[in-house]
């Protein structure tokens, strides 16, 4: 059943990786107490999420924006953390991820947390819509 659902979902996005982002955000919402919009019989939340996406019962743009906001909140906590690993690490020994994340966050500033104004993973063909 999951393989069929994934194939059906591919009509809503233009690649599998974007589908994973959408399904994981919806599964996170379901785990947090959101009500499913499809009937299910003891299905796992990942299958419910994929089914909702395949049945076009969710706004994929809104779902993606929620995923971006969740990621940004996590990154903001990481960057502003008082974790001794980050604070006491020598300047010569900063890993590439930390260096890039910190510099990009500082360059973007506070206005970058607004999803509507950002270009985070934005593209002309990010989502394919089926309008026939």
Curated annotation (Swiss-Prot):
Question: Would you tell me the Gene Ontology cellular component terms?
Answer: DNA-directed RNA polymerase complex
Entry protein name: DNA-directed RNA polymerase subunit omega
Its subunit composition reads:
The RNAP catalytic core consists of 2 alpha, 1 beta, 1 beta' and 1 omega subunit. When a sigma factor is associated with the core the holoenzyme is formed, which can initiate transcription.
Could you state a single Gene Ontology molecular function term? Answer: DNA binding
Q: Spell out the family assignment given in the record's similarity comment.
A: Belongs to the RNA polymerase subunit omega family.
Q: What class of enzyme is it?
A: transferase
Q: Which InterPro entries match?
A: DNA-dir_RNA_pol_omega, Pol_omega/Rpo6/RPB6, RPB6/omega-like_sf
| EC id | 2.7.7.6
Alphabetical UniProt keywords: DNA-directed RNA polymerase, Nucleotidyltransferase, Transcription, Transferase
Q: Which Pfam families match?
A: RNA_pol_Rpb6
- How far does the signal peptide extend, from start to end residue? none
Reaction equation(s) it catalyzes: RNA(n) + a ribonucleoside 5'-triphosphate = RNA(n+1) + diphosphate
Q: Which organism is it from?
A: Ehrlichia ruminantium (strain Welgevonden)
User: What's this protein's function?
Assistant: Promotes RNA polymerase assembly. Latches the N- and C-terminal regions of the beta' subunit thereby facilitating its interaction with the beta and alpha subunits.
Q: Output the GO biological process annotations, alphabetical, semicolon-separated.
A: DNA-templated transcription
Q: Does the keyword Coiled coil apply?
A: no
Tree of life domain: Bacteria
């Amino acid at each position: 059943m999951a393989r069929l659902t994934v194939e059906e979902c591919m009509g809503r996005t233009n690649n599998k990786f974007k589908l994973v982002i959408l399904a994981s955000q919806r599964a996170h919402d379901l785990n947090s107490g959101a009500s499913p919009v499809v009937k299910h019989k003891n299905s796992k939340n990942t299958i419910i999420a994929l089914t909702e996406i395949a049945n076009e019962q969710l706004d994929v743009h809104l779902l993606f924006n929620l995923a971006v906001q969740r990621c940004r909140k996590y990154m903001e906590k990481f960057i502003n953390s008082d974790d001794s690993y980050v604070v006491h690490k020598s300047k010569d020994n900063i890993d590439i991820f930390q260096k890039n994340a910190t510099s990009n966050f500082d360059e973007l500033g506070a206005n970058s947390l607004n999803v509507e104004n950002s270009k985070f993973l934005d593209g002309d063909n990010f989502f394919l819509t089926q309008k026939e």
